[in-house]
Amino acid sequence: MKIGIIAYQGSFEEHYLQLKRAFDKWSINGEITPVKIPKDLKDIDGVIIPGGESTTIGLVAKRLGILDELKEKITSGLPVMGTCAGAIMLAKEVSDAKVGKTSQPLIGAMNISIIRNYYGRQRESFEAIIDLSKIGKGKANVVFIRAPAITKLWGKTQSLAELNGVTVLAEENNILATTFHPELSDTTSIHEYFLHLVKG
């Protein structure tokens, strides 16, 4: 199994370590590779789009010619997990809590509507306990950093976890989106669930 991690910015190293732990837990002989240009997508079984600044990630991905290829592969069934800014990249509809509608480059493959900076600047970073029973796990302490919120889901998209009634983890077929940072959590539950998607 080969998993690619988009490596322009964001926590590549932390996702790498969480994936390694999840591989070890499941006794999977897996390979993890950084993805920056289209040829890096060759032969991968799944891809992670980490946090960072979603507009920057989108612009760089577009400039390097990977944005359209990613969209094509994800639409054709490549398993993907987008965390925080990565979730924004996957959404079909994006607006900003302060400035309203945005026109940033997106993959736009998931039937969700996302509001960037949902919790406001004063809550730039916080931790919260969420219930992961819908993915067969217990409660987990997770980290939110300038987090967006999934405010609308349609089609086959399901909400898998909520915080105060707002979706923080959603799934649609081969696509998983989290508004928190699972790579900074002390549990590998989310990465394990992603590997379960990859294994099919």
Swiss-Prot record:
Question: GO molecular function terms here?
Answer: glutaminase activity; pyridoxal 5'-phosphate synthase (glutamine hydrolysing) activity
Annotated Gene Ontology cellular component terms = cytosol; glutaminase complex
| Cited SUPFAM superfamilies | Class I glutamine amidotransferase-like
- The UniProt entry annotates the active site at C84 (nucleophile), H181 (charge relay system), E183 (charge relay system)
What's in the keyword line of the UniProt record?
A: Glutamine amidotransferase, Hydrolase, Lyase, Pyridoxal phosphate
Q: Which InterPro entries match?
A: Class_I_gatase-like, PdxT/SNO, PdxT/SNO_CS
Positions of L-glutamine binding: G52, E53, S54, R116, I145, R146
The keyword Hydrolase belongs to this UniProt entry's keyword annotation: yes
Q: Name one GO biological process term.
A: pyridoxine metabolic process
Q: Give the Enzyme Commission number.
A: 4.3.3.6, 3.5.1.2
Q: Give the metabolic or biological pathway.
A: Cofactor biosynthesis; pyridoxal 5'-phosphate biosynthesis
What is this enzyme's catalytic activity, as reactions? Answer: aldehydo-D-ribose 5-phosphate + D-glyceraldehyde 3-phosphate + L-glutamine = pyridoxal 5'-phosphate + L-glutamate + phosphate + 3 H2O + H(+); L-glutamine + H2O = L-glutamate + NH4(+)
Q: Which CDD domains match?
A: GATase1_PB
Assembly information from the UniProt record: In the presence of PdxS, forms a dodecamer of heterodimers. Only shows activity in the heterodimer.
Question: HAMAP family of this UniProt entry?
Answer: PdxT (MF_01615)
What is the recorded function of this protein according to its Swiss-Prot or TrEMBL entry?
Answer: Catalyzes the hydrolysis of glutamine to glutamate and ammonia as part of the biosynthesis of pyridoxal 5'-phosphate. The resulting ammonia molecule is channeled to the active site of PdxS.
Family statement drawn from the similarity comment of this UniProt entry = Belongs to the glutaminase PdxT/SNO family.
User: NCBIfam families attached here?
Assistant: PLP_synth_Pdx2
Q: What is the name of the protein in this document?
A: Pyridoxal 5'-phosphate synthase subunit PdxT
* Naturally occurring in which organism (per UniProt): Saccharolobus islandicus (strain Y.N.15.51 / Yellowstone #2)
